Amino acid sequence: MASLRDIKNKINSTKKTSHITKAMEMVSTSKLLKAQSNTQKFNPYMQKMQEVMGTIFGKSSSIKHPMLEKREAKKTLYVVITSDSGLCGGFNANVIRNFVNTVNERHANSEYGIVAIGNYGAEFFRKNGYNVVDSYRDIPDEPSFTQVKKITNKVVGYFIDKEYDE
């Protein structure tokens, strides 16, 4: 039977572990809130860019580029971004739930593909038999331009090569 001292040590150890876990959760929540804030700040810029690009390309018929082609959407590629770990509240669950709902509403069969960014999503999709075209794991909180460019070039390549239409 364990002595009183052993039991007290076990209780203290459990409390310390609990404090560490709570601190990690608070840090993750803070990072998530910062990312959400940055996303909201980016939206007006993105909308203005779309407006400017639409004006430029709408007035010029001489500009030809595969990304500007209008074509029927037969096959869709989704870029799903989750975290690498589970310490971010309901973020991963919400992203996956929204993705699954979208796929169920829009697609009757496997006319879509997934580029999974983050361990959590990549593992979920692999375990559940989804069509994962590509996955990127262990992306840092603030990825470098080179890392983002690599992913972007691959995704744009799928569209240009007409593997996916949207």
Predicted ranges, named:
Residues 2-166:
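Conserved loop-to-helix interface motifs that mediate assembly, gating, or partner/ligand docking
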